[in-house]
Amino acid sequence: MTETITKHERNLSALIHASTFSKFFIPFGNFIIPLVLWTANKKEYEFVDHNGKQALNFQISILLYSILVGMISIPFFLGGFLPNIFDFDNFALSNMHSFNNINFSFDTDDLFGPWMIPVALLGLAQSAIFIVNIIYTILATIKTNEGEVFEYPLTIKFIK
């Protein structure tokens, strides 16, 4: 990218980064709209090609990190709200004759017990991912509109 970058390239690159906010209006808009803009213009403009890859790689990485945090939080969430879910005595053959005696109830005294600590930390991690996504997308939009090359941090290079 040693040649001069035209205003059209800068605007198109900034639009690719800003279009990731379309996820708030269109399901998977943060992938679809940047992908369409990038594929339509990647052969003509090297700067647009670079920024399209950056935006898509960052959005895929953010999705992967969010899924990972969500998967880690499932056992803590289920273990807290449904503490007897892993108690297999209720499903033993010896209890088959007493199916009317099974009582499912929630203990509200221990609703916010120590199991909430990991759930809260994972909730904070999910919030941090969301905030990082917004901040770095805004920074990328501004930097590319100024003609600077922007690299997202903590991005896995899925598209090279």
State where each predicted segment sits:
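Short acidic, low-complexity segments enriched in Ser/Thr/Gly/Pro
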Residues: S105-L111
